[in-house]
Amino acid sequence: MSVNITQFNNYVAAGEFSVGVNTNENNNLLETITFVEEEHLTRLLGARLYNALQTDLAINNDGTATAQKWIDFINGVSYVDPSASDYTINYQGVFRMLKGFVFWQYISEHQYKRTSTGVRKLNAENSSMVDTQMTNALIRRKYNKSVDLYLCAQHFIDDYKTYEATASNIVESPATTYTVTISDTKYLANGDTVTIEGNEYTVANLVDDTSFEFTATTGLTFTDLTVSYEPFPDFKPVKPKYISFA
């Protein structure tokens, strides 16, 4: 079973994404959260990368990630645009995106509710045409805003499709074990594959922003100390579509 990032209370408490459920509807809302998150995150990431995210979320099993790349993916982060070093991107993460998609799905399936703060129309006889149009416009705006955030999340991952850093040295000691001294290991993890001078090696004994090791044939020397890797391998996104207001 998948681990959800957003939780039941995100939609029950008063606020932007409150759906106004009662205790008899709890299971319906939980089913919607699970369905929506799996569907949209799979489309956003691709199936293999979504499974990698789920593996990480399962460690704590409470919707919080452990690997820094997934923490930043979910919660957001400010980072320097790889294509323009003088420009900072303030990535907002996927938390609000998922809440918007869940809100839209749940409210649409149940033909609106969420009294006291606005959205209504459970009984069409008690809803004017204007009320219905305004409600439709509200939930469409929330959906389309989530599409905006979905595209931002894809842009974030695409910015880290390939990452490069320069090691200060690579030393063999003992034989067949190489230690790479490197001050930038952003989103690198043990077991990841790095490429050095066109050859691939598996990362072991990583010390963040300090060093890592790999094993290879003895006697190798390196002149180009560029280390490249893919923080989000198997990224195969599907582009979302906006809902028309026509």
Language-model-derived ranges and their functions:
Residues 1-95, 109-166, 177-181, 221-224, ...:
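Conserved short "hinge" loops at termini or chain/domain junctions
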